[in-house]
Curated annotation (Swiss-Prot):
Assigned keywords, A-Z: Cell inner membrane, Cell membrane, Membrane, Transmembrane, Transmembrane helix
Residue stretches spanning the membrane: 20-40, 54-74, 82-102, 107-127
Protein name as catalogued: Protein PsiE homolog
Cell location: Cell inner membrane
């Protein structure tokens, strides 16, 4: 009986700890997002043309990764302490696209990465069908 009365208290405190941790993570990600914005500005206006296009594209994709993680944390609080699966899939697709942009020397690896993106897109489609949709 004593165990059952403590369970809600433990769950409530663990939820608070998780919320504080996610708020701190969001603050850190916002700092990184600002730093990436400054870096993108430097690459755009101060770098030479040859290297700046690759650095700019890579920076933009990294920027979107930070943005997606912050959006995931916001959605967690908006949806009643639940992480929607589709946001993780978006982050995975963006991360693999960044990997293809940065490391595209081996054609077999690029093909495998592209296949991974296809699998994630199919998963996203299946997760958004009416039978599986929760939100």
């Amino acid at each position: 009986m004593a165990k059952n009365s403590r369970s809600p208290w433990i769950a409530k405190n663990l939820q608070r700890l998780l919320n504080v941790g996610l708020i701190m993570l969001a603050a850190i990600l916002v700092v990184f997002l600002v730093k990436e914005t400054i870096h993108l500005g430097k690459v755009l206006f101060l770098s030479n043309q040859e290297t700046s296009s690759y650095m700019l594209i890579e920076g933009i994709v990294i920027y979107f990764l930070y943005f997606e993680f912050i959006a995931l944390i916001v959605k967690y609080f908006e949806s009643g302490y639940h992480f929607p699966l589709r946001y993780f899939i978006y982050i995975g697709i963006t991360a693999i696209i960044r990997l293809i942009i940065v490391d595209h020397e081996n054609p077999i690896d690029t093909l495998i990465y592209s296949g991974s993106i296809l699998v994630l897109v199919v998963t996203l489609y299946l997760a958004n069908t009416e039978r599986l949709k929760r939100e």
